UniProtKB/Swiss-Prot annotation:
This is Xanthine dehydrogenase 2. Gene3D superfamilies: 3.10.20.30, 3.30.465.10, [2Fe-2S]-binding domain, Aldehyde oxidase/xanthine dehydrogenase, a/b hammerhead, Aldehyde oxidase/xanthine dehydrogenase, molybdopterin binding domain, CO dehydrogenase flavoprotein, C-terminal domain, Uridine Diphospho-n-acetylenolpyruvylglucosamine Reductase, domain 2. The gene is XDH2. Coiled coil: none annotated. The keyword Iron-sulfur applies. Key enzyme involved in purine catabolism. Catalyzes the oxidation of hypoxanthine to xanthine and the oxidation of xanthine to urate. Regulates the level of ureides and plays a role during plant growth and development and senescence. GO terms for cellular component: plasma membrane. It comes from Arabidopsis thaliana (Mouse-ear cress).
């Protein structure tokens, strides 16, 4: 088969025709779009896991003669896979100059975009849903379509609110053919279902349709704003375009084939038996990118009609192997409505399983055959095919077809019964029979878009004999427990012929244990959990079948009603929330809920990030050469293979560094490039530059480094035992006399224990990156970096290049999220890129891939706390003795300051007369850990709340009673001797307790628990007191530069960085109020070291306080200069005043400066004012857990904070919601798994969870069903600008309310089996930890009641 020489390979992008040249078979759609300058589509992960690359693809379905619109991940889609299609990116939806689409305006005005990096992806997912909907989508459909999109900033609530309005619109406002035809009475474009005159033409005429490529749309107005009234139509040329075979080439000898008939495909398969067949590239793309596998021949089977065929008959359903999973889901939903209920039991099981399979973007392109033939041992669908009596139709290159039962198809790990000359043609699924039941099972870390830990498909066919039911046939299949989808053959044999009763259940549960054998140390870990799930799933299946057959035959032995909640499906509840705040307007803008200044740029994709910056001529691309072992001597570095790699320019090592190779934010204890010894996996050995990003990465992988391995320390415990601590990091705080208190008899009870908590990945959606270039012959170095600390970049680059700081400039426009992760570690990226840029005198761009970013840039510190607490029988706390350790990794970075804040916050909000705290920073052979929202404070408070819970358990009281009894009050003296002033803790706690209906909800939870054996609810309230300011005194300073122009507009530059937290917006509000002008007259452009020097990092939640005050200082200087002119004339506008001042030669520029007063702490005495003030807060949470699987959801969360007079209440509420959901990830979802003693199946020192496929941050489905936020009213804060308070970090810890609610629910479960004593629960409380803590007859065969799953700390 050869390419039709007369047929160009084309596509349309945003209505513009594009010819696709040969040679791009290696390229993804995302790379192509960004090369076109369409940078609104972002690269967030490169594996289809975050949704930031989402675009809409439209294609013409010749079978149905309709145009179909669907969202896809551009980062996985091969460029040639969209040949003959229309791709619409965010730029094609709407933009500021021509007008925003209603989706974009709604998202912006609803405060649904913070950092903005994920925003275009959300817009495109929703846009594709609207374009593909014949009727207005339901709220469930909206949330389902967003399941493949991640946001780290907002907590999702405002995004859902923004899009919810489209679920309420009239059906006629959507693009369905019938509704628009009825509405307009006009001709309908067959491609779009929208009015178009080409619809009245003949087919040949339509090809030359002269209608504009846009068509009018009619959506509900939102806020009366003006929107674009244009929608891109499907290009008429593509309607007539005949499908033709394609043969196109690519880099490294790749050839792309697209057959358009089964015969074409079989010919290709005969010629290239080892070729990779693909449809959506969702598996092959990952293999090529992450596993570095090479496939020289790729055959796209997507356009083969025979592989997309559907046939529904009296025997069942036959579907082609190339059918997309989203189409399969629609088909099953259709037949369930149309066929008798008893026939569709398997279809219903597939519907439920597909609903939680990946995200919408993946389901839209992934096909049935790919999922089957990949033969993944954790495939969600293969166990169901096997259990449902499905048959696979296989065709060889001669056209011979054979059938094989699905249950016999899988032979071993990634091995199937199919020869290299065969392909999967179709799948046949028979209808189920009366009394035949099929059920799906899956447990993952997260419900949405996650791979299974264990899954299953189960079927039983029953026959009635008298008053009893006997098993005629059965299939029990598990995934995630063996190298292949595993049939429990002995269990199946046991079941067949037996009476369906509880005795059979018990017998089957015993046999399953011998059918499913997982060895200790097996890949994937979680052995006890996985084994217990096999029993839990079967028990659920037995319950479910019994419930159904009882409706048919009421005489069948059944189970108590309290058991039946175990088989209820997890619904997609509509997420709702309330926001309660007062608006204290000050001047023209301060206090108002203004929209984020960049929101409308972000929703249109026009906002630029580091990777979007247009490249200077001759730019080189860099990749890092990284250590592959945790501790070793470097014997040699051989770059000979790299030199022969395509596009190679140079490799730069420590010997090439012009200045000093030793760097570090506080202590210069790190090498930029390792010289003799590496101390972690991922340590940078050198930087390689090439002509393209891909060529740089390819060449870097070819650099051969030889090592002599050395012993490694891979946990806090190992560090403690080896006394491996960073030098001079022991810290001590003391108040009262702990020993005397313990020995005096004052304490009725003394408890001792240990708290461990894992780390957390920042998972900012924008990876770290820098673009560095020289100017003036190399005399100056400039850079654009994704950083919270431009001054740090300036300092590092100056240091390693041997240049004065005055010749180095760092600029930052905005960040796609930071959360502390871009405070210090990002500076290493800029410094590494600066070396080749300086030496070669060429621009160098270094953007980290997601897996590299997660591996090398550090995380939230894991902690271990060892406590001893004395208290009275009433619950009054008397003494705390605490040893606290954090995992610093292989360098100091900010770990000491992190430890100090943890120690400061180890009282949380409690009055403790006698305190002794000793802290140490552990040296381990992991990449250096770093700042993360809360900066040690949450870890210190979590240790405290754990022993508070234990006191309550010891005294048989509810934890909230112990908390209230020990609250600090106005004037309390902390253990570091700072007096609490304006303490609003009691007030907000009392108000929250009432507004959340705490007592009523607790009673309702107890009632629910008494009636439900396998589902349990728990409630908890948690307070917080978070200190505001840097604990390093000199960092509490800020500068700003303000210019007033003669037209009355104002340009503000300050030292803070906008990373989604709304800093620029708040600062602009301060300036607008100061000058009594509208916010629209104030502009904040960027942060730059040549405008505001020596700026502190944007961190510690202090930026609004500091930079707002600095801007106000500058404004007041200008106002004072303007006053003589203003007092003499009555100016109508500020522009008139500014112009008059200009003519009077008055300086309209000012540099503002602010220092935070009253800060002084001495570690020698352990006394002083560590903080300027405190932000107080409290949260209530109600959760529900499935005790059989560990699955949980947060039913409700109520949060209240004291933020004084908020500068911008909606921005602050966005910070609260985002922090809470991020905190929910820390306490319950996100687990870093390292190669350590706890995970010996992982390569030592390596991070397994280095991408969204394995590391799960909260998705939309993980946010609380109801998320209510209120701000305490009437409490101005005299210690910050305009009586406000800091907000970024304080709410984070409040997610611990969900953690302790989970623990309460587990407590209720344990009480069912007589376990009433206190028990430990480590964070994160993943499904594994929840389930294994809920000890019962299904976990007992594998673990004791005190079993604690392994944790990397």
């Amino acid at each position: 088969m050869e390419q039709n020489e007369f047929m160009e390979a084309i596509m349309y992008v945003n209505g513009v025709r594009r010819v696709l040249p040969d040679g791009l078979a290696h390229m993804t759609l995302l790379e192509y779009l960004r090369d076109l300058g369409l940078t609104g589509t972002k690269l967030g992960c490169g594996e289809g896991g975050c949704g930031s690359c989402t675009v809409m693809v439209s294609s013409y379905d010749r079978e149905s003669k309709t145009c179909v619109h669907y969202a896809v991940n551009a980062c996985l889609a091969p460029l040639y896979s969209v040949e003959g299609m229309h791709v619409i990116s965010i730029e094609g939806v709407g933009h500021r100059k021509l007008g925003l689409h209603p989706l974009q305006e709604s998202l912006a005005s609803s405060h649904g975009s913070q950092c903005g990096f994920c925003t275009p992806g959300f817009v495109m997912s929703m846009y594709a849903l609207l374009r593909s909907s014949k009727n207005s989508p339901s709220e469930e459909e909206i949330e389902e379509c967003l399941a493949g999109n991640l946001c780290r900033c907002t907590g999702y609530r405002p995004i859902i609110d923004a899009f919810r309005v489209f679920a309420k619109s009239d059906d006629a406002l959507y693009s369905g053919l019938s509704s628009l035809s009825l509405q307009d009475g006009s001709n309908i474009c067959p491609s779009t279902g929208k009015p178009c005159s080409c619809g009245s033409k003949t087919t040949s005429e339509a090809a030359t349709c002269n209608e504009d490529r846009f068509q009018s749309i009619s959506y509900s107005d939102i806020d009366g704003a003006k929107y674009t009234d244009k929608e891109l139509i499907f290009p008429p040329e593509l309607l007539l375009r005949k499908l033709a075979p394609l043969k196109l080439g690519g880099n490294e000898g790749i050839t792309w084939y697209r057959p358009v008939s089964l015969q074409n495909l079989l010919e290709l398969k005969a010629n290239f038996p080892d070729a990779k067949l693909l449809v959506g590239n969702t598996e092959v793309g990952i293999e090529m990118r992450l596993k570095r596998l090479q496939y020289p021949v790729l055959i796209s089977a997507a356009q083969v009609p025979e592989l997309n065929a559907l046939n529904v008959n009296d025997n069942g359903i036959e579907v082609g192997s190339a059918l997309r999973l989203s189409e399969l889901l629609r088909l099953f939903r259709k037949v369930v409505k149309e066929r008798p209920a008893h026939e569709t039991s398997a279809c219903k099981a597939f519907i439920e399983q597909l609903k939680w399979f990946a995200g919408t973007q993946i389901r839209n392109v992934a096909c049935i055959g790919g999922n089957i033939c990949t033969a993944s041992p954790i495939s969600d669908l293969n166990p169901l095919w096997m259990a449902s009596r499905a048959e696979f139709r296989i065709i060889n290159c001669n056209g011979d077809v054979r059938s094989i039962p699905a249950k016999d198809f899988f032979l071993g790990y990634r091995k199937v019964d199919m020869g290299s000359n065969e392909i999967l043609l179709s799948v046949f699924l028979p209808w189920t029979r009366p009394l035949e039941y099929v059920k799906e099972f899956k447990q993952a870390h997260r419900r949405d878009d996650d791979i299974a830990i264990v899954n299953g498909g189960m079927r039983v066919f029953l026959e009635e004999k008298g008053q009893q039911l006997f098993v005629s046939d059965a299939s029990i299949v598990y995934g995630g427990v063996a190298p292949l989808s595993l049939r429990a053959r002995n269990t199946e044999e046991l079941l067949i012929g037996k009476n369906w009763n509880k005795c059979l259940l018990q017998d089957a549960l015993k046999v399953i244990q011998s059918d499913v054998l997982i060895k200790e140390g097996a890949p994937g870990g979680m052995v006890e959990f996985r084994k217990s799930l096999t029993l839990s799933f079967f028990f659920k299946f037995f319950l479910w079948v019994t419930h159904h057959v009882n409706n048919v035959n009421p005489t069948i032995e059944t189970f108590p009603p309290s058991h039946m909640s175990a088989v209820q499906l997890v619904p997609r509840f509509s997420r709702i929330g309330k926001q309660d705040y007062e608006t204290v307007k000050q001047g023209t803008s301060v206090g108002l809920p203004e929209v984020h200044l960049s929101a409308r740029m972000q929703v249109t994709g026009e906002a630029e990030y580091t990777d979007d910056t247009p490249l200077p001529p001759c730019t080189l691309h860099a990749a890092l050469v990284l250590s592959k072992v945790p501790h070793a001597r470097i014997l040699s570095v051989d770059d000979s293979a790299a030199k022969s790699s395509s596009g190679f320019v140079g490799l730069f090592l420590a010997k090439d560094v012009p200045g000093n190779n030793m760097i570090g934010p506080i202590v210069a204890d790190e090498e930029l490039f390792a010289t003799d010894v590496v101390t972690c996996v991922g340590q940078v050995i050198g930087v390689l530059v090439a002509d393209t990003h891909e060529n740089a990465k390819t060449a870097a992988r070819k650099v051969d480094v030889r090592y002599q391995e050395l012993p490694a320390i891979l946990s806090i415990k190992e560090a403690i035992n080896a006394k491996s601590f960073h030098p001079n990091t022991e810290r001590r705080l003391r108040k009262g006399d702990v020993e005397l208190c313990f020995q005096s008899g004052q304490c009725d009870r003394i408890i001792e224990g240990e708290v461990q908590m894992g780390g957390q990945e920042h998972f900012y959606l924008e990876p770290n990156g820098s673009l560095v270039w020289t100017i003036d012959g190399g005399n100056e170095v400039h850079m654009i970096s994704s950083t919270q600390a431009p001054q740090q970049h300036q300092k590092y680059v100056s240091h390693v290049l041997g240049l004065p700081m005055s010749k180095v400039v760092c600029k930052t426009k905005r960040l796609g999220g930071g959360f502390g992760g871009k405070e210090t570690r990002s500076a290493f990226i800029a410094a590494a890129a600066s070396v080749p840029s300086y030496l070669l005198n060429r621009p160098v761009k270094l953007i980290l891939d997601r897996d590299v970013d997660m591996m090398i840039t550090g995380h939230r510190h894991s902690f271990v706390g060892k406590y001893k607490v004395g208290f009275t029988n009433e619950g009054k706390i008397l003494a705390l003795d605490l040893e606290i350790y954090n995992n610093g990794g292989n360098s100091m970075d900010l770990s000491l300051s992190n430890l100090e804040r943890a120690m400061f916050h180890s009282d949380n909000v409690y009055e403790i007369p006698h305190v002794r705290i000793v802290g140490n920073v552990c040296f381990t052979n992991f990449p250096s850990n770093t700042a993360f929202r809360g900066f040690g404070g949450p870890q210190g408070m979590l240790i405290t709340e754990n022993w508070i819970q234990r006191i309550a358990a010891e005294l048989d009281k509810i934890p909230e009673e112990i908390k209230e009894m020990n609250f600090q009050v106005e004037g309390s003296i902390t253990h570091y001797f700072q007096s609490l002033q304006h303490c609003t803790l009691h007030q907000l706690w009392k108000e929250l307790k009432v507004s959340s209906n705490f007592l009523k909800t607790r009673r309702e939870a107890d009632e629910f628990n008494s009636h439900n054996r396998w589902k349990k609810r728990g409630v908890a309230m948690v307070p917080t007191k978070f200190g505001i300011s840097f604990t390093t005194k000199f960092m509490n300073q800020a500068g700003a530069l303000v210019h007033v122009y003669t037209d009355g507009t104002v340009l503000v530059t300050h030292g803070g960085v906008e990373m989604g937290q709304g800093l620029h917006t708040k600062v602009a509000q301060v300036a607008a109020t100061a000058f009594n002008i509208l916010l629209s007259s104030v502009f904040v452009s960027e942060t730059s070291t040549d405008k505001v020097p020596n700026a502190s990092p944007t961190a510690a939640s202090a930026s609004s306080d500091m930079y707002g005050a600095a801007v106000l200082d500058a404004c007041e200087q200008i106002i004072a200069r303007m006053e003589p002119v203003a007092s003499k004339h009555n100016f109508n506008t500020f522009s008139e005043l500014a112009s008059a001042c200009y003519f009077q030669r008055i300086d309209l520029s000012a540099h503002g400066f602010h220092i935070v007063p009253e800060l002084e702490f001495d570690w020698v005495s352990g006394k002083g004012n560590a903080y300027r003030y405190y932000t107080y807060g409290a949260a209530f949470a109600e959760v529900e857990i499935d005790t059989l699987t560990g699955d949980f959801h947060t039913r409700k969360a109520d949060i209240m904070l004291d933020l004084g007079y908020s500068l911008n209440p909606t921005i602050d509420i966005g910070q609260i919601e985002g922090a809470f959901v991020q905190g929910l990830g820390w306490v319950a979802l996100e687990e870093l798994k390292w190669g350590d003693a706890a995970h010996k199946w992982i390569k030592p020192g390596s991070l397994l969870t280095c991408g969204p496929g394995s590391y799960k941050i909260p998705s939309i489905n993980d946010m609380p069903f109801q998320l209510n936020v209120s701000l305490l009213k009437g409490n101005p804060n005299a210690k910050a600008i305009h009586s406000s308070k800091a907000v970024g970090e304080p709410p984070f810890f409040l997610a611990a309310s969900a953690f302790f609610a989970i623990k309460e629910a587990i407590k209720a479960a344990r009480s069912e089996v007589g376990l009433t004593n206190w028990f430990p629960l480590e964070t994160p409380a993943t499904p594994e930890r929840i389930r294994m803590a809920c000890f019962d007859e299904f976990s007992a065969p594998f673990a004791n009641s005190d079993f604690c799953p392994k944790l990397s700390v």
